[in-house]
Curated annotation (Swiss-Prot):
It holds the Pfam family EF1_GNE. EF-1-beta and EF-1-delta stimulate the exchange of GDP bound to EF-1-alpha to GTP. Belongs to the EF-1-beta/EF-1-delta family. This is Elongation factor 1-delta 1. InterPro entries: eEF-1beta-like_sf, EF1B_bsu/dsu, EF1B_bsu/dsu_GNE, Glutathione-S-Trfase_C_sf, Transl_elong_EF1B/ribsomal_bS6, Transl_elong_EF1B_B/D_CS. It comes from Arabidopsis thaliana. PANTHER family: EF-HAND AND COILED-COIL DOMAIN-CONTAINING FAMILY MEMBER (PTHR11595), ELONGATION FACTOR 1-BETA (PTHR11595:SF21). Residues 10-73 form the GST C-terminal domain.
Amino acid sequence: MAAFPNLNSDAGLKKLDEHLLTRSYITGYQASKDDITVFAALAKPPTSQYVNASRWYNHIDALLRISGVSAEGSGVIVEGSAPITEEAVATPPAADSKDAAADEEDDDDVDLFGEETEEEKKAAEERAASVKASTKKKESGKSSVLIDIKPWDDETDMKKLEEAVKSIQMEGLFWGASKLVPVGYGIKKLQILCTIVDDLVSIDTMIEEQLTVEPINEYVQSCDIVAFNKI
């Protein structure tokens, strides 16, 4: 489990940045509700000073965007619960909130905001020290890329366009979720997410040499990189 102080303070951002030094996500090995909770607690994206937190924020933002979820909202209060505020999201529950804690245990069997034990803190420090001290060659990194692919006109068969795009297969390239987004005049563009192994795939080269040349350019007019984030 992970616990953070006020995430809109320097201390909170520093804690988050250190936590993400050896992790791609808040907990586990894929995006979860924990990432959404922390993402929502941040009033604005972390600055480049917090390299790891900024990288994580951009990645979660891209995942939300491809899922059709806006990163902004007008605020919400659920009857019988506290407003979603910095304190409610980022601060551990008060000691006398026994009933609320019991309900959370029934739902998840995990106290998401409990404090780290000494063993967990020590293990996290050892992992961070190991990463900094390691002289071994790092494994090739991965990146998450969101691409806009535009057709020639409103008569372009978008199903065939998507099939043509996904027909591009190479080592280190993994196609993900996609959706059609209206752009006007009856025309829709394909927005698609992919994951690449940085040392094996160049997105720019793939666009220039495969996505915009024959036979795929029968359907594809142009491609734009919307988001590019290290993971």
